[in-house]
């Protein structure tokens, strides 16, 4: 009862003055003080147009993977699922600019979290698939389409469970419904929960980085121990595939650590900031890098795979991962 009364006081005391540089959070907690307002309302229209262009690119790629290639090779299933996650993320960010109502933050922030979790799981799955293929003695050592779809299904289920718990926590005391939060969303219902989520976010991305780093290192070791003539070029392409994801995760870890160390709990700017609209660029770069390196690997391996037996060498596995049916 005491906690509910305190939560109600927080909700009533939260004030926001338009035209100022800071949120005026009249709450007796140092974590709420000196929160800077960085929203630029003039950027919303530009951002929506930019996100519309990005969404068109992603939808075109989805059509290419599904209609043009018919998900052949099976690695295109990974890329199609990644496109779906990015498309949903873009539509979520567009909705954050215009969606009304007190539940906007609960719905859109958890959809964005879902896309982030699913995207990370997909990239980890692709890395494991790639590593598994190069260490297999079979010509088709990569995951089957059924196995990939099963992995994606459980990744979706796991991500949904996480955002369900997060949504319940965010909405438990009404802080998300405070007046005047246009342009910002609280990520938690209390300072303690906020710090716990930052730690969880840091650890989650750390796990992603560790799995992908180990998987990539094992893949590179295996490639370098083969008799392929252009194995160094293949290794460069494999590294290029993993670098964008690793950079994004390391950036997210740094951001979470800095926010945790600041002892602040400020509303997260979700609209009216040009950097938010440009944040989808790295994800598009990742997709193009996958497509480019796959094509590059295919041309690199084509003249070499004919001289290897599919039962004794891994060259066929490399070619399959590169996009060769």
Curated annotation (Swiss-Prot):
GO molecular function (one): G protein-coupled receptor activity
Transmembrane segments: 45-65, 71-91, 106-126, 145-165, 198-218, 233-253, 274-294
Membrane topology: Multi-pass membrane protein
Gene3D superfamilies to which the protein is assigned, alphabetical: Rhodopsin 7-helix transmembrane proteins (1.20.1070.10)
Main location: host cell
Domain of life the protein comes from: Viruses
Keywords tagged on the record: G-protein coupled receptor, Host membrane, Membrane, Receptor, Transducer, Transmembrane, Transmembrane helix
Entry similarity comment: Belongs to the G-protein coupled receptor 1 family.
Protein name, per record: G-protein coupled receptor E6
UniProt source species: Equine herpesvirus 2 (strain 86/87) (EHV-2)
Lineage: Viruses, Duplodnaviria, Heunggongvirae, Peploviricota, Herviviricetes
């Amino acid at each position: 009862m005491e906690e509910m009364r305190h939560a109600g006081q927080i909700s009533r005391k939260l004030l926001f003055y338009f035209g100022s540089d800071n949120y005026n959070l009249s709450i007796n907690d140092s974590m709420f003080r000196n929160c800077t307002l960085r929203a630029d309302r003039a950027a919303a229209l530009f951002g929506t147009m930019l996100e519309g262009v990005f969404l068109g690119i992603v939808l075109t790629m989805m059509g290419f993977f599904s209609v043009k290639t018919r998900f052949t090779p099976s690695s295109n299933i990974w890329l199609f699922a990644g496109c779906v996650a990015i498309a949903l993320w873009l539509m979520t960010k567009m909705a954050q600019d215009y969606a009304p109502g007190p539940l906007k933050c609960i719905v859109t922030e958890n959809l964005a979290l879902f896309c982030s979790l699913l995207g990370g799981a997909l990239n980890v799955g692709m890395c494991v698939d790639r590593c598994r293929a190069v260490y297999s003695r079979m010509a088709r050592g990569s995951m089957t389409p059924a196995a990939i779809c099963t992995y994606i299904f459980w990744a979706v289920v796991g991500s949904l469970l996480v955002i369900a718990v997060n949504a319940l926590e965010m909405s438990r005391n009404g802080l998300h419904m405070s007046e005047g939060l246009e342009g910002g969303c609280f990520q938690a219902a209390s300072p303690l929960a906020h710090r716990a989520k930052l730690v969880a976010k840091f650890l989650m991305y750390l796990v992603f980085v560790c799995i992908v780093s180990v998987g990539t290192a094992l893949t590179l070791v295996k490639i370098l121990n083969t008799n392929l003539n252009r194995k160094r070029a293949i290794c460069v392409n494999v590294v290029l595939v993993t670098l964008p994801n690793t950079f994004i995760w390391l950036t997210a870890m740094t951001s979470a650590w800095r926010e945790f160390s600041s002892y602040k709990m400020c509303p997260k700017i979700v609209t009216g900031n040009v950097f938010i609209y440009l944040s989808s660029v790295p994800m598009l770069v990742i997709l193009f890098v996958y497509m480019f390196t796959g094509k590059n690997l295919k041309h690199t391996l084509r003249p070499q795979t004919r001289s290897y037996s599919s039962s004794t060498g891994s060259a066929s596995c490399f070619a399959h991962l590169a996009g060769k049916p």
